[in-house]
């Protein structure tokens, strides 16, 4: 078994080692590229304060770029007996460069190293999630505009209630995504602060230039207090998890609607054939499996904040190994959500709409409020109009022309989609991803 970075004269029990390392080696592959970027910024700073020579920095940067390239191509591995990505990178540098490779850990702990890895990984993933949300948003706005005049029943308590439209239905989920993106942006801003230099959570006697690493990595600012930087472990993941859960909640609800509306009892929409499956016994079946799985995965994602909170529950300040377990639920969540967003965008783009739903007289009573409002507009007291229409319904005498004239903001005839699009543009622009992208390109010399 390879020697641990922290190992002294007492050999480690292999069973205990397997238990304590757990799935860290598997999870740390998510962080490999980001560990290299953090190390590049750190050693550049070390050279500036005299802890590395210019020649040593040049050698280290060149080799770190090679390691980054292998991670980018999916070829980076953590060898048997090596407990984490930090140990693997340092081992590779030491094999290649000898004692120079052993210098990169000056002024650093694996505590702040994993903190910066997690933040670099998370902000990169948040950018990809934001892009997928924006793609789904544009599909929904386009469909809302296309079908703005197609009426459908609106429901309360799953009882037919009032006229709605596909313009409203698609647009409602688009605007929900705007709110979700605001949540995501807040999580990004909390994530985009530099913990590097906090070491084990109590700083360092080396004269570290934390402003320099903040700038090199493209962070907005830093976690200034070194104790708080470590306290932020788990808190950052929890905050991001709430944002992911918010998006997942929107997608799950939309998937439920689409599954229900595509059933024969509703018949409002038809899902793409390639997104349905058949039955082994019933030849007529077209089951909405893709959206059912999307709904289930999104419901699972909505539990993520609670999982993280329970792992960190009642921990005092400082680092604890409990926090390692968060990676197992947090790191894979991004891919799962992105896949759900991609499936949702595909289905909602190809979904077919029934444009004649309200021809069926079973939906006649959704126009009851329209009739009440018409009578009230002609001078009848609203409560009297309400009573008259109710009695007409009970007597089987209610009729209506199945037309609506709604003009106020956000209604059937005035969707305000242009304003919703403007809100989304403002939120997207507020992320300012270009700063982090430029910083990372500069570190890599690209």
Swiss-Prot record:
Family matches, as InterPro entries: Argininosuccinate_lyase (IPR009049), Fumarase/histidase_N (IPR024083), Fumarate_lyase_CS (IPR020557), Fumarate_lyase_fam (IPR000362), Fumarate_lyase_N (IPR022761), L-Aspartase-like (IPR008948)
Subcellular localization: Cytoplasm
Keywords per UniProt: Amino-acid biosynthesis, Arginine biosynthesis, Cytoplasm, Lyase
Any one Gene Ontology BP term: L-arginine biosynthetic process
Gene Ontology MF terms: argininosuccinate lyase activity
Pathway: Amino-acid biosynthesis; L-arginine biosynthesis; L-arginine from L-ornithine and carbamoyl phosphate: step 3/3
GO cellular component: a single term: cytosol
EC number: 4.3.2.1
Catalytic activity field: 2-(N(omega)-L-arginino)succinate = fumarate + L-arginine
Pfam family, any one: Lyase_1
The keyword Magnesium is annotated on this UniProt entry: no
Family: Belongs to the lyase 1 family. Argininosuccinate lyase subfamily.
The protein's name: Argininosuccinate lyase
Organism: Phocaeicola vulgatus (strain ATCC 8482 / DSM 1447 / JCM 5826 / CCUG 4940 / NBRC 14291 / NCTC 11154)
The encoding gene: argH
